[in-house]
Each structure stands twice: as structure tokens, then as C-alpha cells.
Amino acid sequence: RKGRRDKVAKVKTAALKGSPQRRGVCTRVYTTTPKKPNSALRKVARVKLTSQVEVTAYIPGEGHNLQEHSMVLVRGGRVKDLPGVRYK
């Protein structure tokens, strides 16, 4: 009759809507602390993308000049020790 359904792979970067990168505007720039064995102040930003989705994005590198209303280009890629941060 009907065979078993194939599992549909879950999209890890849904907010990018299939694009490699997406532009956005920083709504909040702040620091958070990582999960248990690690200790630091990781720089992250809340970004409203052109796809009208608001995501939390990591700010890589040492030092940055981002503030509220800064235009940023967001790509996929999670930060393992920050829960909920799936963009850079």
C-alpha cells in the first residue's frame, strides 16, 4: 500500500531561507556566558534579517565596532557552547 515515509532533514539555518548569507540590522549587542565547562564573555547580537526573522548571531574575532542599527551580513554556523546561537 503505502511504504514507510522518508524522514525530512531539519533545516539548521531556517532564518536564511536557503540563502548562503542574509543582511540584517542589529537590534541589540550584548555579551553572554557559555555553557558549563567553559568560561568567557561571548559577544553576540540580536539581528533582524531581511527575511523579517529575528535571530541571535555570534560576533567572531577579537574586538568589534557593532552597535544598535549596524548593518551586518549573517551566515549560518552554530557556536557550540552558546545555546540558541546558530548564526555568525
From Swiss-Prot:
The ranges of region (Disordered) come to 1-24
Q: Does the keyword tRNA-binding apply?
A: yes
**CDD domains associated with the record:** Ribosomal_S12 (cd03368)
Query: Where, by residue number, does the polypeptide cross the bilayer?
Result: none
**Keyword vocabulary terms for this entry:** Methylation, Ribonucleoprotein, Ribosomal protein, RNA-binding, rRNA-binding, tRNA-binding
Source organism, top-level taxon: Bacteria
What are the GO BP annotations of this UniProt entry? translation
Please give the PROSITE patterns that the UniProt record associates with this protein.
RIBOSOMAL_S12
Give the Pfam families listed for this entry: Ribosom_S12_S23 (PF00164)
Name the protein family: Belongs to the universal ribosomal protein uS12 family.
The entry describes its oligomerization and partners as: Part of the 30S ribosomal subunit. Contacts proteins S8 and S17. May interact with IF1 in the 30S initiation complex.
> What is the protein's given name?
Small ribosomal subunit protein uS12
Organism this protein belongs to: Mycobacterium gordonae
Q: What is the lineage of its organism?
A: Bacteria, Bacillati, Actinomycetota, Actinomycetes, Mycobacteriales
